Design a protein with these regions (language model features):
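A general, composition-driven signal for non-globular sequence regions
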Residues: 38, 48, 91-93
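Exposed beta-strand-loop-beta-strand "reactive/processing" segments of non-cytosolic proteins
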Residues: 43-87
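A short, surface-exposed interaction/processing loop segment used at functional sites
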Residues: 81-103
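N-terminal trafficking/processing presequences and adjacent post-cleavage segments
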Residues: 1-39
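A broad structural signal for short, well-ordered beta-strand segments within beta-sheet-rich domains
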Residues: 32, 50-52, 95
Length: 103
């Protein structure tokens, strides 16, 4: 990703907003169970969206006893994939870890 786009992305705090909004998207996904789930990020960033793929598969973390789930998807800017994200959650809904990669 070029420096200007990367700076724009970070200057709006989008990584933190992704983290904050994911539980809401999780609830919507649980109710709809689509193959893919799109979410436009917000009125101030209409060209940024999330595309969720293959949600809720087990994450093999041998040192944790609870069921684990991994959310994975693409970060899209002007209809172009600019990166990906993954978040790990325990079966009871407790946040575990995340990865955000801007390419």
């Amino acid at each position: 990703m070029d420096g200007a786009l990367y700076s724009w992305f970070l200057s709006r705090g989008l990584i933190d907003r992704f983290r904050a909004d994911l539980p809401k998207f999780l609830d919507a996904y649980r109710q709809e169970e689509p193959e893919e789930f799109y979410e436009v990020f917000g009125a101030d960033c209409p060209d940024v969206s999330l595309k969720y793929l293959k949600l809720f598969y087990e994450l093999p973390l041998n040192y944790v006893e609870d069921p684990k789930y991994l959310i994975t998807g693409d970060m899209i800017f002007h209809e172009r994939v600019i990166g990906w994200f993954r978040q790990a959650w325990l079966g009871d809904g407790t946040y575990f870890d995340d990865w955000f990669v801007i390419e």
